[in-house]
Amino acid sequence: MIKRLRGLLVLLCCVAGMAMAEEKNILVTSGSDRATPIAVVPFGVQGGSVLPEDMADIISNDLRNSGYYGPIPRQNMISLPTQASEVIFRDWKALGAQYVMVGSIVPSGGRLQVSYALFNVATEQQVLTGSVAGGVDQLRDMAHYIADQSFEKLTGIKGAFSTRMLYVTAERFSTNNTRYTLQRSDYDGARAVTLLQSREPILSPRFAPDGKRIAYVSFEQKRPRIFIQHIDTGRREQITNFEGLNGAPAWSPDGTRLAFVLSKDGNPDIYVMNVASRQITRVTAGPGINTEPFWGKDGNTLYFTSDRGGKPQIYKQSVGGGGAERVTFVGNYNANPKLSADEKTLVMIHRQQGFTNFKVAAQDLQRGSVKILTETSLDESPTVAPNGTMLIYATRQQGRGVLMLVSLNGRVRLPLPTAQGEVREPSWSPYLN
């Protein structure tokens, strides 16, 4: 749907031939200062048991993905302590590490008891210690938990490594035979499970704030309709059946309302539905396309994409009515708005004046400056971690749709492992614990 709307917006803008908005703000190219060096030493495993995954490696990758920390490569480690008494601080000072984590794992009867400790290398003081237990099949959960605890202790920001992600894959077997699969995985693409399969497109999956329900668009009736699905049971409810476009669902912060796009009255406009009563209220009106709503934390403000000024730009408007206020001014295309957790940063799909590529960018809402976050092109569907430190987006590499993870500070850019086929439409979960 985003691709279709992008094409429609661009086409309308070209036909209109209207002058581009004045570039009032500043464009900043992405820079990258050095991340804080940290060493996550391989955890010792009692009895030499072989575990299905490397817990320390998962923790290290989590901390790296945040963009705050740069893990010391294992091949550079001078010593490999597994408990506090074995830490030789001069080894880590020689490597320039500011923090070092050690840990040990005790397997017993299909369960794991994990102990860990984190040290400040300069002060030689312990800053965090803890333990966690679970089944072998929960190894990744425990690793993400330790990374969450460590990240919050060091930064004061709640970790988002135990969250999940939704995305859609499309596998084409022949001209008229494509299988679409809605998947849920760890935020890093691991442990994907199938929530829905269809021979018709699935678009715009979105987690509810409780993390237990999702909304999405399905074409299973040969036309777009919005569904709500309960993750645990798989129970589904169709909630729209209007003529024309039914798309771009977005949950309100309290989970009681859905904003979405309908074209039943002519142009695509944004409506809000009370999920319990199914009553809808129209929010936007007038000429042009209004689409891709995203809620502010106050539950009263909607950010959205509109071409009302001649080119796709981002606006905000009260759900209760009133005029829309334009938010973006840099570039001749800004769409698909997402807000960081503190609502100081607007993440969007952006095209610079004079360029043809679409990139993920972040706008400082106080200063108005815009920073390009990605080095790919044809980017779409950015989704931001609940703590605002990372984002995932869809793009194309070597002719295939893939997902990429980027830290908002610009230090980390990496592809996520996903299933075969075209991968698109990522959506980050809220905190789940």
Curated annotation (Swiss-Prot):
One cellular component term from this protein's GO annotations in UniProt: periplasmic space
Keyword Cell cycle: yes
Cystine pairs: none
Signal peptide: 1-21
Any Pfam family the entry gives: PD40
A single BP term in Gene Ontology: protein import
Keyword tags: Cell cycle, Cell division, Periplasm, Signal
Subcellular compartments: Periplasm
Subunit structure: The Tol-Pal system is composed of five core proteins: the inner membrane proteins TolA, TolQ and TolR, the periplasmic protein TolB and the outer membrane protein Pal. They form a network linking the inner and outer membranes and the peptidoglycan layer.
Function: Part of the Tol-Pal system, which plays a role in outer membrane invagination during cell division and is important for maintaining outer membrane integrity.
Family named by the database record: Belongs to the TolB family.
Protein name per its UniProtKB record: Tol-Pal system protein TolB
Organism: Pseudomonas entomophila (strain L48)
Gene it is expressed from: tolB
